[in-house]
Amino acid sequence: MSHLRRRRFKLSLCALPVSIDRLLNFPAEKQMSVNDSIDPRFVFHVEDESLRFRVGDSGTKIRELETVGDRHFRTQQGFCGNRIEKDETMYSDGDDEEYDVSIRRRTALIQPGIDSGNNYDSAAAEETNRESKNPVGWELVVREDGEGNSTIDRHEMEFKVRITKPDGNVSNSHRNTQQKRDFASVEKERVTTTSVSSWESLKAILSDPVTGALMNDATILPCGHSFGAGGLKEVKKMKACFTCSQPTLEGSEKPNLSLRIVVHAFRQEEDSDHIHTLKRRKERSDQKRSFCIPNITETPKSSRGIQFPFSIGDHIIIEGNKRTPPRFVGRIAVIMTQCLNGWYVVKTVDNSESIKLQHCSLAKISDNSSTKVTVAEMPPSWL
């Protein structure tokens, strides 16, 4: 029995290449059969039509995955170097009247002269051809509402904006977004501009419409318009109001006391503000000067005290201290070298012996001759 089983297994193995050759050369339109001299043990039966594997089919394979939400991912792949990938993500806020923003990433690698073989309808093919002409990048689609309003936020990138109108027309435009400005600086600039404009408008109201000067001596006419001294002269010449051209009589004008009080208060406020501005400007300039320009008259900390009282070539007397050798005390020497931190190398006059001493151990020889004689007659300390 074992011998028969071995022989049957060998025959099956010999028939395997022939079966594989038939399988490869089998037409794609027909389903594989078990009765074509193929061992049933080497045949896999596919009952599901969607899971059928066909050899030699060069058509494109499309896999579509649809989720429950608003996202829809679609992948298209083809042979012969043609590849079209299109990932589309759509975001909706749930309101049909608001615009929908969809960001599409398009990637197209198409060889010229080769048909892509897509099996879509004419509208989808036209959209694919139109998108393949555009450069690879991000596309921001803004759909207008019924009233024709469309607004988009500014981002840090350059987008291609497609505005889809309700009638189906599509208009493309490039929009270079600006960088985000600091909110605090914008708010400060707006407050400053508002205050300046209100101040200027108030000054224009309190000024004479003829001369433009503040109406310190405001006078009101029967028509209700007020003028200063310069404007009142012009009104008397014309015998009519400069603003409304209403005729006026001589002596019909009266002083506008309330307007004079307001102008006086405005002038005081303007003067005080101007004085405060000058003071702040002066303080700021003084502060900059104190930080930038050092005071020349002030001695630095490193040079405080007398650290370098002598110069090279000066004649000095060695006074010495506790660490100075006794034989140098009281002798006349000459400054030879100036060192750091007030140290000097001195050389004695009588025997040219050098020693390094600090400035506090030295004293300058005065011009008094008696001092020189006393020093000259002083015997050496080492004798």
UniProtKB/Swiss-Prot annotation:
PROSITE patterns: U_BOX
Family annotation (Pfam families): PUB62-63_C
Enzyme Commission (EC) number: 2.3.2.27
Domain of life: Eukaryota
Functional pathway: Protein modification; protein ubiquitination
Reaction equations catalysed: S-ubiquitinyl-[E2 ubiquitin-conjugating enzyme]-L-cysteine + [acceptor protein]-L-lysine = [E2 ubiquitin-conjugating enzyme]-L-cysteine + N(6)-ubiquitinyl-[acceptor protein]-L-lysine
U-box domain: residues covered: 201-273
Keywords for this protein: Transferase, Ubl conjugation pathway
Function: Functions as an E3 ubiquitin ligase.
Protein name: U-box domain-containing protein 63
Biological source species: Arabidopsis thaliana (Mouse-ear cress)
